[in-house]
Design a protein with these regions (language model features):
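Conserved nucleotide-binding and Mg2+-coordinating catalytic segments in signaling enzymes
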Residues: 3-23, 46-60, 68
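Short regulatory alpha-helical coupling segments
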Residues: 4-5, 18-39, 71-79, 97
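Short, conserved catalytic or interaction motifs in soluble domains
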Residues: 56, 97, 175
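A short pre-motif secondary-structure segment
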Residues: 83-86
Length: 184
């Protein structure tokens, strides 16, 4: 049991890794076989903005700190609503049990508010480094999101389609003005 948990958990952030996310989806799909209705699902594909700058400038310890702080925010805003996974690198996916656009938008705004309240984790970074840093406003840690949603989702293929839609939206955001979200 502990080995399975270790194989499904991102050891740095404590959230599911990609394999863990797909395992959770397989378990949900198995559970849905006996139900007449599927689940309403919202999916947020999240990419950290300016992460590479901090990781390259201040080192991997600071990159790790940022990943942990972001994962904690995602975990906090999704408690009781869904799962969070580190999809790879500085990308995260939140799968939430709602297809209500307004609720999904409130969750996105809560994420941005929490990041903004930390000034892009400036104090945490300075504490870790042991000295102050100058951060240009355009270099603050933020995130960009692609958000997709659907009703009556019954299988992993449907979730894979939501991931693709959200990833495409995320790409659109990242090629424009970062630090925003876009809905399907």
């Amino acid at each position: 049991k502990r080995l399975q948990a270790a194989a499904e958990t991102d050891m740095l952030t404590g959230v599911y890794n990609r394999a863990g996310m797909y395992q959770q989806l397989a378990e949900i799909e198995e559970h849905l076989k006996d139900r007449s209705e599927g689940l309403d699902i919202g999916l947020m594909f999240i990419d950290l903005d300016n992460f590479k700058h901090y990781n390259d400038t201040y080192g991997h310890d600071i990159g790790d700190l940022i990943l942990k702080e972001m994962a904690a925010i995602f975990r906090d805003v999704s408690i009781g609503k869904g799962i969070v996974s580190r999809f790879g690198g500085d990308e995260f996916i939140m799968i939430l049990e709602t297809n209500d656009r307004k609720e999904l938008e409130e969750i996105a705004k809560e994420i941005y508010a929490r990041i903004e309240a930390t000034s892009g984790f400036k104090k945490q970074i300075e504490k870790h480094l042991g000295h102050e840093i100058e951060v240009d406003e355009s270099r603050l840690i933020t995130c960009s999101m692609g958000i997709s949603y659907a009703a009556n989702v019954r299988n992993e293929d449907s979730v894979s389609e939501l991931i693709k839609q959200a990833d495409d939206l995320l790409y659109t955001v990242k090629t424009g003005e970062k630090g925003h979200y876009k809905f399907i």
